[in-house]
Amino acid sequence: MADLFLDKILVKNNRDQDELDTEREIWERLENRVILLFFAKSRSSQCQEFAPLLKDFFVRLTDEFYVDRSSQLALVYVSLDQSEEEQERFLKDMPKRWLFVPFKDEEFRRNLEAQFSVSRVPVLVVLKPSGHVISFNAVDEVVRLGPPCFKNWQEVSEIIDRSFLLPEFTDDRAGRSMTDPIRRIKYKDETTNEKKKRKHCDDEDEGGGGGTEFF
């Protein structure tokens, strides 16, 4: 998935509009997640109708007010608006966890539009973490099924279930349990003891002591 955004910039839809401008930052936000590419324009009546539904869909899957842990889902908004002001008005009421392609990067926005054959809006492309397409337009699916359709995408994507990890957007080290070192030491001790026991039994066998037989 990172290849799609290689050498590109994505922006967080937060107050400061923080930029993800390194491959590592983008990879950490998108890897092992179902990716939604949302193509829309603020002046479209159909987009205006669908946007609140998509917002609710996304929030119910990622906001811990509704779920114990955020689903492995990311959304990148690709604006087809006529101006940056229109884009900003559209995104103003959308979730802060959304990402978007900078309006000034028109070439990249147009390339995505062509790559996914976007001829009308709204369009919601669903991608596996690998970048392979699950659906070229899941708008109707989201409208009809709501959040349950994410489970289908998740199964098709074969993403790793990280429900056992600490909160999302942490690096691999932060995702490890605090008890990992203890468990590793314990496992090592147990393995050492097993070797000692096996050696002791082998010594008894050699000496005719009839030690325990291992299979």
Curated annotation (Swiss-Prot):
Pfam families on file: Thioredoxin_8
Domain Thioredoxin: 1-165
Region (Disordered): 185-215
Keywords, comma-separated and alphabetical: Cell projection
Similarity annotation: Belongs to the nucleoredoxin family.
Highest taxon in the source lineage: Eukaryota
GO cellular component: mitochondrion; photoreceptor outer segment
Name this polypeptide is given: Nucleoredoxin-like protein 1
GO BP: photoreceptor cell maintenance
Main localization (coarse): other
Basic and acidic residues composition-biased segments: 185-194
